Amino acid sequence: MSEEQRLNRARFRLAILKEMRAVHRQRQDTWGLKRDKLAERMGMDEARVSRILNGDEVLTIGLVAEFFHALEAHPTIRAELYEQIESCWRKWHAGIDAALGEKP
């Protein structure tokens, strides 16, 4: 994999994470999933979960996987989470197409 491909993958992952954080902030009450419950599911303290969701902690791929696992177990979240990922994926591809001068 070329350096450019690695960079693009990293950008995409970061975009997904940002989208997840934004959605979590917007939907926390709607989902009925509080930070204490999320912390419990992830086996972390609530302060760390708050730092992660607020963007104050560096995210790793492993941490992202933990979040997906914890959030996916909540039935109300699953559909919205995948919808946000798909939306992010479409935006990312549209950006690449535009950069290459291609029409979607």
Please give the residue ranges for each predicted region.
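N-terminal flexible/basic segments that precede or flank functional cores
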Residues: 1-29, 88-104
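Intrinsically disordered, low-complexity tails and linkers flanking structured cores
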Residues: 37-40, 65, 69, 82-104
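Short alpha-helical DNA-recognition segment
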Residues: 26-50
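DNA major-groove recognition helix of helix-turn-helix/homeodomain DNA-binding modules
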Residues: 62-78
